[in-house]
Amino acid sequence: VQVGSIECLQSAQNWQRKSLSLQGLNLLQSVLIKLTTGKISITTSSGEYITASGPMLIFLAKDQTIHITMEETHEQLNYNLIELDSASIKNAYNFFLYEHADFSAPLTKPTTKHLLAPIETGVARVFNLLHSSNKSQKLSQDKKEYLIRFLLSEFI
């Protein structure tokens, strides 16, 4: 399926297919994907190839176009995603780099536009809380940024 925006990826889960391929997704904002079950393969406009099986947390940086293939493994494909605005990512970066040097984030600029991390205890619940609050606007901006920092700390 040829598409343009990331909203198509979220709604594609309702199509209930064993495999799904979406071409030309433009990431205007960074995206955090919680892959619970299934397998995902992503090719980016910069030539990176990413493959992961659930449970896995996947971060994709903004300003790139991706081609994504998702398929069932032993269970039905199950994933959710959250778009992250630039201000939240910048706040998290500054928090880890300047306020908590014990995280020792590297000072070199990353060469990839993606990150992968296994889903640890509590991460899925925090992701689900943030995902549902984005729809219902229940949480304050401060609480959302705290939860985003928690999720992004999985990649350190």
Feature-to-residue mapping (PLM):
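N-terminal regulatory/effector-sensing and dimerization cores
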Residues: 2-105
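An amphipathic alpha-helical interaction segment
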Residues: 109-156
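Short intrinsically disordered, low-complexity coil segments enriched in acidic
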Residues: 1-5, 153-156
